[in-house]
């Protein structure tokens, strides 16, 4: 088996499905004997990435500024330095930078792959996610979205690989873990109780369905069920206005003492 070098491009390594998928692919590559290189601005998941045996190159390729164009040459140099076989872009701006870097390489160039993790607003800027030699779509909905808005895309290049979870990290239990519930309630008193605990992990974006979860909780509590709602991952820099909006929604529904929004 020939050892491959795969370079993944993304803005940062803080939290979210893109970041988790990046770590999972890096781990799979290393376990299979390949070389995994990740380019990002870094973040709290960086120690976990490096513990997997992957390499990280710090480069702020997600900052929306004209100055980011200077990273095209840096990426081109990096691709040559590591002798990249595959460049895998997971976000729009990093994808554009990687695309431009590859276009300036003479001779044999690395293959260019993208993963469309969501339903980006249709535009020339977003179209880069459909330009990969192979485009990984995390759902059939994402595949249909790309084909509908970028009809020139060859459907044979799109591959649906649904996102999933590691069952070892999220094991099924025959009954609720009361000790775990008590620990969580100790950190977030709003979650204390014996009733159902609703969990909605995800970044603070409207696509995640936070308002629907709050409406569901309000209906359950209105029907007499002592349900609680935990939304981890949504409290992030730049999401403050959205969080305030949701807090106000819980207040209007008189359920603010049964909801925890956390990092």
Segments and roles (model prediction):
Residues 8-73, 157, 234:
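N-terminal strand-loop element at the rim of the active site
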Residues 16-27, 196, 200-225, 244:
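A conserved mid-protein helix/loop that constitutes part of the nucleotide-sugar donor-binding site
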Residues 39-44, 201, 228-244:
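Glycosyltransferase donor-sugar binding loop
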Residues 79, 103-140, 151-152:
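A conserved, positively charged/aromatic
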Residues 88-95, 116:
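Short His-centered aromatic/hydrophobic patch
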Residues 141, 164:
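Carbohydrate-associated surface elements
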Residues 171-190, 245-247:
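A short helix/loop element that forms part of the nucleotide-sugar donor recognition site in Leloir-type
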Residues 243-263:
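Nucleotide-activated donor-binding/catalytic signature segment of Leloir-type glycosyltransferases, i.e.
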